[in-house]
Amino acid sequence: LIACYDGNGSNFGTHPQNVLRGMIYDTKTWEYPYLYNLIDQYRDLAKYNNGYSYNMMFVGPGWMNKMGRWEQPYELLLKSYTDGCNYYGKLKKEGKLIDMTMSEFADYFREKKGINAGNYNEPECAPWRDILYGSDKQLFWYCDPYMRACVNMDQGGAIVDLRPYVAKLEWPVGIGTKHVQDASYPFLIQEKYRAGYFTHYAGAGTVRSAKLSHNGEEVDLCLCPTHSHFSEEVIDGKKTRILTLDPVDIEFYDVKLTLQTKEYFEEGSSNIKIERSILSMSDPNAEVYLDEYITACYGTTEYPEDMTGITLAKLDGATAVSAVIPAIQTKVSLTPSAKAEGYIEEGYAFSPMFKLGYKKQITDKEVFATWLNLEKAN
């Protein structure tokens, strides 16, 4: 989930077999610095998770047989496994690692996260950057008992994966159930299965983003790559994780503006606040409009589900726009920080999505926020 979102999982597994299978090593020297860098990248997550990070190197010995595997000879397979174990052993001796069985880790996790005390709200936070392909791309994963979200800085901070755990679905899996193989929790947004912003057909894929428009020109923030910085603050007594994105410049034919995005994840709240700040505008009198939107559906695969049971609603004065999805017992809504024009849109057969949004004229130095709220709908 953290790193293999865009490609081959072999490139992001921290046991040596995966790194060899991904061919991320020097064929002449049989060295694989990427393996150690990747392990260290997982270790780095302790900075964002109250001093804790987790990594696993679980492999059976079968792939080290003397007949070799894939294109690697036995000697390289054995060397890579030995080197990997030695690196973990070195970290342990330096007091930088504690090795546990899975049952020991389960006990540690329940205590660490407050589950034993009946107070499980602390999230898992994973800022992740590409250290393999040279893309300079960043993702951020947020997961707590109420939701899981992925923010893609390569798409201007768009939310590209969203799971509404707050519904706490009973979802039996296995033989004799409706879900024999598919153990996935249903998504509201999933850009790989439901296209995201970059769709090849008429219509739209699932994404939570914003558009800026001026005199018939339109720019989606999905087209504005940037980077983010993670912080944690207590706001109104609530622990909040904050992503502060680097400002982006948006240039229309006769107006240029600089916009900054902040995304707030309040612990235990099941909502995400997205705040847009206009830092500068070349013409303060220009008519520029902001369209905050979420295009969503539900499902676990790339195949559309039955959308006929979904109810879209817009409250008087557009204090909230919402969708209730009975099939996954979920209500999703957007609410604004100031008066704005709320709207709802139905999908159609070739683009089976629904859309919720707010449109507002924005001015220089203005700050406008919207909340994406998730609730259980009985």
Where in this protein do the model-derived segments appear?
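Surface beta-strand/loop "capping" patches
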Residues: 110-151
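Short, surface-exposed beta-strand/loop "edge" segments at domain boundaries and coil↔beta transitions
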Residues: 63-68, 148-150, 169-173, 246-259, ...
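Beta-strand-rich recognition/accessory modules
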Residues: 26-40, 50-60, 234, 244-249, ...
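Acidic, contiguous internal or C-terminal segments within carbohydrate-active enzymes
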Residues: 239-304
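Solvent-exposed beta-hairpin/edge-strand motifs
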Residues: 99, 294-316
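Broad, structure-driven detector of short, well-ordered beta-strand segments within folded domains
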Residues: 146-153, 255-267, 321-336
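Acidic-aromatic substrate-binding/catalytic surfaces of carbohydrate-active enzymes
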Residues: 148-251
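Catalytic grooves of carbohydrate-active enzymes
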Residues: 1-107, 361-364, 371-375
